Amino acid sequence: MVIRFDQIGSLVLSMKSLASLSFQRCLRENSSLVAALDRLDAAVDELSALSFDALTTPERDRARRDRDHHPWSRSRSQLSPRMAHGAVHQCQWPKAVWAVIDNP
């Protein structure tokens, strides 16, 4: 590929536009992730207010089975090391919820 000198300016602008679009996409994904985590926190707060003593043994067994196959378990392995050791890693509520289900 041969680039003439008079095309360099438009090439640089194209590269800047591409970088800007990529950055905007990352921001959009980040805000979506933060919003999803906020909804998850709200759901956990609601779940924490409930009494797990009301669960029957079959319901507890189902919860344990679902826990082992839950997407959250798989999604943690997909996190970048920075995220895995950052705020997402500090979220201990899954352990607390499953501990209550496992030990009524």
Curated annotation (Swiss-Prot):
Residues 58-71 have a biased composition (Basic and acidic residues). Residues 58-84 are annotated as: Disordered. Induction: A member of the dormancy regulon. Induced in response to reduced oxygen tension (hypoxia) and low levels of nitric oxide (NO). This is Uncharacterized protein MT3211. It comes from Mycobacterium tuberculosis (strain CDC 1551 / Oshkosh).
